[in-house]
């Protein structure tokens, strides 16, 4: 039966104790990590979120009843122990912060017993993630997950402190909002009072933070919960957290400057890492041309080389056709990989096909200078020599080429570059390389929808010098948009916003909105623009992804207390679940089963 902690008050967390506390009487409380009974001598490791301390029950130093009680302790029992801190009688444990000391107890209370847990609570558990997520409250006891959440809390606290000192106001925006179909799917919430109508959960506080600028608040921030009904992957969740901000009377440089100082503070105070300022900047066009990605990992080289002009007159039909169809030929140089086995090269070809490429052409330069190529017979010796020279090829190098439309070539070689970096172990997790990517295209063409869509969102300001093309050549227009990239991951993005009614109307028109549709969906914002709008800009970080990278984790699930899995379900609470028919009736909702598509043969 559980004992009361009445009369006891915890004096220290377990790992707060040190050699400086020797001789002090202390009260510790926590979970039993391990219990070792050596007959008349019982060692109990007690754990809380700060760490572990060893408690020693020994004949001659502890009462027999106390030793007997300690021998019955099991893993995850919750205990309170009163005792004296002493130097360890045995060997020092260098693996523990408290490894020099132990506690000699005079009182033990069992506050709560535990059944045998489904897995051992330990660092870097090898237990299947599905099991750990089902018992997440146990999983969260593990020291590595606790460190991640402690780090997350510290990042949030430091962010609040920094932004408050910079004159930002923390203002909450609504969670029940109007649905706008542009972009990813909304989560919808039915209204009981206004049946047949729905709220949406926000994908970001975008419109409200712009309205706060219209309202004269100047500098806003919020650590905001956001929601997106989309297919999940390692770095996405249906509900996620943003560090969101907006500033008035600023331009691109102002937003970048304050955020560079924020990042420098976070990395210095949380990780002890100095961020060199100013952070490097690169236009979207340069990033795509050099790295095949708008979020390039610049911890390593292996940049793309455009060899279109070098091979434009060759007879290799793959290169020839791509160039004639308005495409390009580009390559990457995998240094030292010239001896790669053909089977591995074939796997790289298959990898490339996943990104839309029809294949990969290659030149393998062996250490002895001999050249093996998939297309040598279609090239003259001089053409081959010129191509190798253009690629910076040396003995021992593997040159890989893609030829197609720009997007296919960029996507293929950008992904291949990262895959080779992983295989060649070029990625250092202890290195943090930041990059600003700027001047994104304002719009991108959607083949599926047969229209332009906003690359960021419909409220992004075009660059002044490109405004002249918004009607005649919208695909040419660049945006005053910027993303902050860390080690090949976009951790934040923002833009200068449109604050001119005419430009906003043109933007809606290019996106295919009629005046009525624009008014229906964004009328409140357009009306606000009639009453004096300051120039404004903002940025939002994905807090989950930022902490994931700072904590050197591979999934954001490891930095979120209660995450969802890939089908957007919660294995612990079994959400989503069915609801009572009466609740649906109150909402005026009937659930209709999806009809299965009939086989054509039927």
Name each model-derived stretch.
Residues 1-602:
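Class II aminoacyl-tRNA synthetase catalytic cores and aaRS-like
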């Amino acid at each position: 039966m559980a004992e009361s902690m009445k009369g006891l008050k915890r004096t220290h967390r377990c790992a707060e104790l040190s050699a400086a506390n020797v001789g002090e009487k202390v009260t510790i409380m926590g979970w039993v990590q391990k219990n070792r009974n050596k007959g008349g001598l019982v060692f109990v490791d007690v754990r809380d979120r700060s760490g572990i301390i060893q408690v020693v029950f020994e004949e001659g130093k502890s009462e027999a009843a106390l030793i007997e009680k300690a021998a019955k302790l099991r893993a995850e029992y919750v205990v309170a122990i009163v005792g004296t801190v002493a130097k360890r009688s045995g060997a020092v444990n260098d693996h523990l912060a408290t490894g020099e000391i132990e506690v000699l107890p005079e009182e033990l209370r069992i506050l709560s017993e535990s059944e045998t847990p489904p897995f051992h609570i330990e660092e870097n558990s090898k237990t299947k993630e599905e099991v750990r997520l089902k018992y997440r409250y146990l999983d969260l006891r593990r020291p590595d997950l606790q460190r991640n959440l402690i780090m997350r809390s510290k990042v949030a606290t430091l962010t609040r402190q920094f932004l408050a000192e910079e004159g930002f106001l923390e203002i909450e925006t609504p969670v029940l909002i109007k649905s706008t179909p542009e972009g990813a799917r909304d989560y919808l919430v039915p209204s009981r009072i206004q049946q047949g109508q729905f709220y949406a959960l926000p994908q970001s506080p975008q419109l409200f933070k712009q309205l706060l600028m219209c309202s004269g608040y100047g500098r806003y921030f919020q650590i905001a919960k956001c929601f997106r009904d989309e297919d999940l992957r390692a770095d996405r969740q249906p509900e996620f957290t943003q560090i969101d901000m907006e500033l008035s009377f600023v331009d691109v440089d102002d937003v970048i400057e304050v955020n560079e100082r924020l990042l420098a503070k976070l990395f210095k105070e949380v990780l002890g890492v100095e961020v060199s300022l100013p952070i490097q900047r690169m236009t979207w066009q340069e990033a795509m041309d050099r790295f095949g990605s708008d979020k390039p990992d610049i911890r390593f080289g292996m940049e793309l080389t455009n060899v279109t002009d070098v091979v434009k007159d060759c007879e290799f039909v793959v290169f020839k056709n791509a160039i004639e169809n308005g495409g390009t030929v580009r390559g990457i140089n995998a240094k030292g990989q010239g001896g790669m086995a053909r089977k591995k090269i074939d796997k790289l070809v298959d990898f490339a096909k996943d990104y839309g490429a029809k294949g990969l052409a290659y030149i393998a330069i062996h250490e002895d200078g001999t050249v093996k190529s998939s297309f040598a017979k279609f090239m003259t010796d001089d053409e081959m020599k010129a191509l190798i020279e253009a690629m910076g090829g040396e003995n021992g190098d593997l040159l890989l080429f893609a030829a197609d439309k720009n997007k296919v070539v960029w996507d293929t070689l950008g992904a291949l570059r990262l895959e080779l970096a992983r295989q060649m172990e070029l990625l250092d997790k202890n290195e943090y390389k930041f990059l600003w990517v700027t001047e994104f295209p304002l719009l991108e063409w959607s083949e599926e929808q047969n229209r332009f869509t906003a690359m960021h969102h419909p409220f992004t300001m075009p660059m002044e010098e490109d405004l002249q093309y918004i009607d005649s050549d919208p695909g040419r227009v660049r945006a005053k948009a910027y993303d902050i990239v860390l080690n090949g991951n976009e951790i934040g993005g923002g833009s200068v916003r449109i604050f001119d009614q005419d430009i906003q109307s043109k933007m809606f028109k290019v996106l295919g909105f009629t005046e009525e549709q624009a008014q229906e969906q964004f009328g409140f914002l357009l009306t606000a623009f009639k009453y004096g709008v300051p120039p404004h800009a903002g940025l939002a970080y994905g807090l989950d992804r930022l902490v994931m990278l700072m904590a050197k984790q591979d999934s954001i699930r490891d930095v979120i207390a209660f995450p969802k899995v890939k089908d957007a379900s919660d294995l612990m609470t079994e959400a989503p679940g069915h609801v009572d028919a009466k609740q649906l009736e109150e909402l005026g909702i009937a659930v209709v089963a999806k009809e299965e598509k009939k086989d054509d043969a039927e």
